[in-house]
């Protein structure tokens, strides 16, 4: 399915050791050897942060001869005051790092992979018509002509084929934290961006789209790469003067990660709406990140008969459902493809957020609540404890 996840056999919560600061992955979680995400205490100043990073580099330099190969502090981030960095350390050094009183916690970096896509050849796409009608079976997508104009959508994914005709020149390349290839060699990112803002396949047909590549052509990456992309997008939104008028779609996730959840929460606090796929494991989404992060809009997948998709995650952290089974959208090379997954559901909501921001002037911090307010109670088979709300754009269509 289209959901991008952390490859693991267990989604149990990370155990906490070393006075609550050095987190350890459970057996079965696929960690990057000797690689970590270091998160600083709230309120640490830029000067204190730089002092710590210099100290960490010196500590690492003194101990790396014990094992070799580790590179020390790497990319750093500052997401709305959440400061930290990714690093490659030996065991002795990481314990020293965790003991620093300015460090909040250290978490192992983990691998991110794409799950297999479910493809139905030449299947019709029904998602757009469904979100503009209070009843199932509609064939037309009805929307206001503002169509997300003036709103920026960041696609944090495998990249975007920005030259695809479905974007009509509204897509641009932002950054790449995954590799040195500024293309979408996977297709997932182009599909999700098209669902959010494509001229033919998208919800917000006039919104701008920015590619934030955090996963490679094979759909693989790390939490640290994803967080680096989120950090870049928040800073770019501020530089554009688009705070409160920006949307981020993350059709990815996996095993619970405190660092990922903290980063996601800070994205929202910074003034960027964040739509997140609930996951495709048919389990409680509270076990997944960033689906379980506070203040994000967590989206489950529905079918064209208003059922809860068999694969979708569920539970109290789900804010609403959106179409996620057999969704057709743009694909690299100028064509289109039909895919299924909560990855397909989340960008419907990202597009709806951009649509309502342009139409009603809703700010990013209020967008999820407004979307839930407009949603209709149509999901007949929602698991116990899960909302029955389905995305609706509020247009007066039947």
UniProtKB/Swiss-Prot annotation:
What does the pH dependence annotation say? Active at neutral to pH 8 with casein as substrate.
* Cleaved propeptide residues: 20-115
Signal sequence residues: 1-19
Q: Where is this region: IgE-binding?
A: 124-134, 163-170, 227-245, 310-318
* All copies of domain Peptidase S8, residue ranges: 125-398
List residue numbers at the site (Important for catalytic activity): 280
GO terms in the biological process aspect are: proteolysis
GO MF, one annotated term: IgE binding
Per UniProt, subcellular location reads as: Secreted
User: What region holds the Inhibitor I9 domain?
Assistant: 35-113
Q: Which UniProt keywords apply?
A: Allergen, Glycoprotein, Hydrolase, IgE-binding protein, Protease, Secreted, Serine protease, Signal, Zymogen
Q: Which residues form the active site?
A: 157, 188, 343
Q: Which residues form a coiled coil?
A: none
Give positions of region: Disordered: 175-195
Which superkingdom heads the taxonomic lineage of this protein's source?
A: Eukaryota
Choose one Gene Ontology CC annotation of this protein and give it.
extracellular space
Q: Any inhibitors or activators noted?
A: Inhibited by phenylmethanesulfonyl fluoride (PMSF) and diethyl pyrocarbonate (DEPC), but not by benzamidine.
EC class of this enzyme? hydrolase
Q: Which residues are glycosylated?
A: 113, 249
Enzyme Commission (EC) number: 3.4.21.-
**What is known about what this protein does?**
Serine protease. Hydrolyzes casein, gelatin and human collagen type IV, but not elastin in vitro. Hydrolyzes OCLN of the human lung epithelial cells at 202-Gln-|-Ser-203 and Gln-211-|-Ile-212.
What's the protein here called?
Answer: Subtilisin-like serine protease Pen ch 13
């Amino acid at each position: 399915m289209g959901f991008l996840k952390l490859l693991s056999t267990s989604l149990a919560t990370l155990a906490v050791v070393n006075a609550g600061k050095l987190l350890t992955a459970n057996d079965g979680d696929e960690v990057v050897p000797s690689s970590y995400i270091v998160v600083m205490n709230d309120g640490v100043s830029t000067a204190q942060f730089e002092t710590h990073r210099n100290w960490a580099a010196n500590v690492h330099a003194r101990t790396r001869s014990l094992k070799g190969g580790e590179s020390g502090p790497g990319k750093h981030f500052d997401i709305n005051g959440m400061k930290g960095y990714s690093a490659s350390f030996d065991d002795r050094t990481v314990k020293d790092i965790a003991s620093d009183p300015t460090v909040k916690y250290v978490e192992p970096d983990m691998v991110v992979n794409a799950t297999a896509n479910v493809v139905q050849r030449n299947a019709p796409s029904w998602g757009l018509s469904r979100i503009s009608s209070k009843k199932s079976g509609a064939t037309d997508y009805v929307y206001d002509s503002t169509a997300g104009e003036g709103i920026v959508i960041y696609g944090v994914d495998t990249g975007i084929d920005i030259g695809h005709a479905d974007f009509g020149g509204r897509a641009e390349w932002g950054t790449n934290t995954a590799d040195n290839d500024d293309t979408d060699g996977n297709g997932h990112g182009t599909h999700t961006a098209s669902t959010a803002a494509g001229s033919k396949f998208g919800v917000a047909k006039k919104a701008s789209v920015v590619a934030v590549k955090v996963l490679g052509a094979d759909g693989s990456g790390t939490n640290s790469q994803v967080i680096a992309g989120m950090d870049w997008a928040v800073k770019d939104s501020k530089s554009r003067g688009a705070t409160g008028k920006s949307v981020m779609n993350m059709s990815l996730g996996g095993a619970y990660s405190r660092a990922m959840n903290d980063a996601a929460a800070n994205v929202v606090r910074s003034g960027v709406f964040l739509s997140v796929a609930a996951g495709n494991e048919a389990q409680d989404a509270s076990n997944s990140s960033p689906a379980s992060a506070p203040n994000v809009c967590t989206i489950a997948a529905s079918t064209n008969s208003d059922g809860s998709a068999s694969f979708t995650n569920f539970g109290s952290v789900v804010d609403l459902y959106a179409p996620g089974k057999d969704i057709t959208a743009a694909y690299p090379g100028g064509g289109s493809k039909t895919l299924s997954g909560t990855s397909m559901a989340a960008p419907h909501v990202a597009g709806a957020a951009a649509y309502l921001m342009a139409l009603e002037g809703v700010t990013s911090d209020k967008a999820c609540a407004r979307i839930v307010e407009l949603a209709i109670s149509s999901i007949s088979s929602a698991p116990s404890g899960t909302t029955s709300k389905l995305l609706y754009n509020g247009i007066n269509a039947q």
